[in-house]
């Protein structure tokens, strides 16, 4: 699910922490990718012309494999060396979120049964997409044959991606989930595995710039994210993103905020603290997650197993042999070239001061107001 409203807060208060770039900008980088999130994207986005999922003659879904094969090739073509991280067992605290998802699934199935148009049916079917154990296993088999390393995390894939980045095994963690920032990955890449046809730039978020720009410690940032709404517990009812940030900056921790609300000083009867709120346990899952020590992991990219890859994709899954062979050639070329040095590796980046970050935030807000006024003028002329 990620963190509700966090991207908007960063965009408004620390716009310089988000850099939008073309995929070519990451040439020479190693990246740890949240595999479960990517597979979910592929199952939704990689479709036939009629909107249905891709399948082979036996009726087996192949959208996830098509997405994994060709999106990985795109990264390799652009000089990126990806490794994928799969979710392990979810933390016990996540059970409440999984229960909510199950309830929503039942409701969606009901809406699908009642749908009368093909468009509505397609919409509800996409909401029912779920990454299964079989999808994960098939993707892992494909990556092994392609020569791309993968890891099965003890629990959350995002936490393991962040660990690899923190230990210097990769440059960044790649996921659509903003909660990856809570694990203090140096950089978070969003939209990396999107289709090229979307023309969506990759968003690179600098975690340390976010912390400095918001003037929060990592502990306070995690508390903010819990207040905004995360997968591990409920948030304070009635408190939106703007108020959550204000409360954290004023009081410094959830404990102090709870004291403030319970004392009656807030004069706000709409704010409701959840009963038996496990925010402390949620905080520790972010600050001290269960991961494999990055120093113990050796990432290795190997030449693709050409014969086995053709058998798996072409014979078993009925992919086009011509296209698969072309993909194998691209893989061989990309993986053989290795990681070349980047010019920015020879220069030390000078951290931005609080004043510079504040000035950038002010400029962004002024531009936002200017664009709003322009839109009003345009509408008035119509």
Curated annotation (Swiss-Prot):
Region (I-domain): 120-251
Keyword Aminoacyl-tRNA synthetase: no
UniProt xrefs under Gene3D superfamilies: 5' to 3' exonuclease, C-terminal subdomain (1.10.150.20), 5'-nuclease (3.40.50.1010)
CDD domains membership: H3TH_FEN1-Euk (cd09907), PIN_FEN1 (cd09867)
Pfam families, alphabetized: XPG_I (PF00867), XPG_N (PF00752)
Keywords, alphabetical: DNA damage, DNA repair, DNA replication, Endonuclease, Exonuclease, Hydrolase, Magnesium, Metal-binding, Mitochondrion, Nuclease, Nucleus, Phosphoprotein
Alphabetical GO biological process terms: base-excision repair; DNA replication, removal of RNA primer
A single Gene Ontology CC term: nucleolus
Keyword Transmembrane belongs to the record: no
Region annotation (N-domain) ranges: 1-105
Coiled-coil regions listed in the entry: none
InterPro entries to which the protein is assigned, alphabetical: 5-3_exonuclease_C_sf, Flap_endonuc, HhH2, PIN-like_dom_sf, XPG-I_dom, XPG/Rad2, XPG_CS, XPG_DNA_repair_N
Residues that coordinate or bind Mg(2+) 2: 177, 179, 231
Modifications made to the protein after synthesis: Phosphorylated. Phosphorylation upon DNA damage induces relocalization to the nuclear plasma.
Subunit structure as annotated in this protein's UniProt entry: Interacts with PCNA. Three molecules of RAD27 bind to one PCNA trimer with each molecule binding to one PCNA monomer. PCNA stimulates the nuclease activity without altering cleavage specificity.
Function: Structure-specific nuclease with 5'-flap endonuclease and 5'-3' exonuclease activities involved in DNA replication and repair. During DNA replication, cleaves the 5'-overhanging flap structure that is generated by displacement synthesis when DNA polymerase encounters the 5'-end of a downstream Okazaki fragment. It enters the flap from the 5'-end and then tracks to cleave the flap base, leaving a nick for ligation. Also involved in the long patch base excision repair (LP-BER) pathway, by cleaving within the apurinic/apyrimidinic (AP) site-terminated flap.
Protein name, per record: Flap endonuclease 1
């Amino acid at each position: 699910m990620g963190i509700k409203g966090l991207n908007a807060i960063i965009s408004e208060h620390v716009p310089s922490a988000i850099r939008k770039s073309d995929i070519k900008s990451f040439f020479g980088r190693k990246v740890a990718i949240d595999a479960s999130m990517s597979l979910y994207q592929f199952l939704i986005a990689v479709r036939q012309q009629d909107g249905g999922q891709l399948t082979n003659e036996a009726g087996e879904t192949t959208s996830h494999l098509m997405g994994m094969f060709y999106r990985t090739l795109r990264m390799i073509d652009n000089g990126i060396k990806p490794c994928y991280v799969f979710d392990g067992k979810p933390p016990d605290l996540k059970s409440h979120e999984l229960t909510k998802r199950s309830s929503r699934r039942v409701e969606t199935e009901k809406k699908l049964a009642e749908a009368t148009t093909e468009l509505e049916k397609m919409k509800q079917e996409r909401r029912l997409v779920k990454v299964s154990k079989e999808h994960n296993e098939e993707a892992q088999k494909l990556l092994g044959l392609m020569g791309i390393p993968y890891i099965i995390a003890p629990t959350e894939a995002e936490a393991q991606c962040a660990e690899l980045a923190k230990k210097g095994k990769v440059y960044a963690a790649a996921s659509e989930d903003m909660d990856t920032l809570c694990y203090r990955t140096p950089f978070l890449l969003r939209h990396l595995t999107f289709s090229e046809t979307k023309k969506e730039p990759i968003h690179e978020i600098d975690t340390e710039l976010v912390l400095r720009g918001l003037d929060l410690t990592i502990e306070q940032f995690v508390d903010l994210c819990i207040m905004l709404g995360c997968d591990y517990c409920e948030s304070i009812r009635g408190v939106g993103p703007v108020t959550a940030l204000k409360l954290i900056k004023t009081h410094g921790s959830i404990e102090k905020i709870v004291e403030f609300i319970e004392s009656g000083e807030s004069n706000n009867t709409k704010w409701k603290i959840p009963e038996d709120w496990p925010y402390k346990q949620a905080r520790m899952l972010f600050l001290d997650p269960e991961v494999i020590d990055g120093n113990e992991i050796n990432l290795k990219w190997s030449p693709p197993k050409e014969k086995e890859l053709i058998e798996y994709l072409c014979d078993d899954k009925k992919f086009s042999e011509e296209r698969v062979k072309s993909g194998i050639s691209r893989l061989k070329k990309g993986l053989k070239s290795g990681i070349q040095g980047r010019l920015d590796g020879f220069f030390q980046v000078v951290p931005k001061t609080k004043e510079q970050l504040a000035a950038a935030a002010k400029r962004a807000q002024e531009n936002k107001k200017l664009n709003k006024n322009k839109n009003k003028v345009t509408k008035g002329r119509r």
